[in-house]
């Protein structure tokens, strides 16, 4: 599990975990509305930087009172999306980046602000699977490059290294809506 803060938001602590061999994805999908986390299909993530970029953008939207979703955790999924089409954008982001019934690797994100308490063991109470270190190496083992390229409309983008693709993903996230 990664526990971190973003320098611009020192009062918000982030807990991020990667799980593989998840055996209860259908149950999680059915109870998503009650869970206070962002739950992302790890096939759609290539790097820590990609996810942290979306988290930063979601926190910025919250700080400016511009959330387009009901909470920060859903906003993270929306911020992963490179598209700025407001129509059906939230549903599309959930379909593209959220946990699916066939997901076997997932990333959970919990943002804790102020006096709110959180027990990190809560992740393993929700997910039946093996918790891994949240690292670029572990994410790349789960990443589906074709799905990522399709989600970000980068099918023709040529790159020699995955770091270049990761940078393109971060740019797409940060430039969306400008």
Swiss-Prot record:
Highest taxon of the lineage: Eukaryota
Subcellular location: Nucleus; Chromosome, Telomere
GO cellular component: chromosome, telomeric region; cytosol; EKC/KEOPS complex; nucleus
Annotated Gene3D superfamilies: CGI121/TPRKB
Pfam families: CGI-121
Spans traversing the lipid bilayer: none
InterPro entries, sorted: CGI121/TPRKB, CGI121/TPRKB_sf
Single GO term (MF): tRNA binding
Keyword Chloroplast (UniProt): no
Any one GO BP annotation for this protein: tRNA threonylcarbamoyladenosine modification
Entry keyword set: Activator, Chromosome, Nucleus, Telomere, Transcription, Transcription regulation, tRNA processing
SUBUNIT field: Component of the EKC/KEOPS complex composed of at least BUD32, CGI121, GON7, KAE1 and PCC1; the whole complex dimerizes.
Purpose of the protein: Component of the EKC/KEOPS complex that is required for the formation of a threonylcarbamoyl group on adenosine at position 37 (t(6)A37) in tRNAs that read codons beginning with adenine. The complex is probably involved in the transfer of the threonylcarbamoyl moiety of threonylcarbamoyl-AMP (TC-AMP) to the N6 group of A37. CGI121 acts as an allosteric effector that regulates the t(6)A activity of the complex. The EKC/KEOPS complex also promotes both telomere uncapping and telomere elongation. The complex is required for efficient recruitment of transcriptional coactivators.
Family label: Belongs to the CGI121/TPRKB family.
Protein name per Swiss-Prot or TrEMBL: EKC/KEOPS complex subunit CGI121
């Amino acid at each position: 599990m990664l526990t971190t803060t973003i320098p611009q938001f020192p009062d918000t602590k982030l807990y991020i975990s990667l799980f593989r061999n998840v055996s209860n994805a259908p149950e999680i999908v059915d109870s998503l509305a009650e869970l206070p986390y962002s739950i992302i299909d790890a096939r759609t993530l290539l790097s820590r930087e990609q996810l942290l970029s979306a988290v930063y953008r979601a926190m910025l939207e919250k700080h400016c009172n511009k959330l387009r979703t009901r909470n920060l955790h859903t906003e993270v999924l929306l911020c992963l999306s490179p598209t700025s089409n407001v129509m059906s954008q939230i549903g599309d982001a959930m379909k593209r980046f959220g946990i699916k019934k066939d997901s076997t690797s997932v990333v959970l994100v919990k943002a804790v602000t102020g006096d709110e308490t959180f027990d990190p063991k809560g992740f393993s109470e929700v997910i039946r699977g093996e918790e891994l270190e949240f690292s670029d190496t572990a994410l790349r083992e789960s990443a589906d490059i074709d799905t990522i390229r399709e989600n970000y409309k980068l099918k023709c983008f040529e790159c020699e290294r995955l770091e270049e693709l990761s940078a393109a993903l971060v740019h797409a996230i940060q430039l969306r809506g400008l």
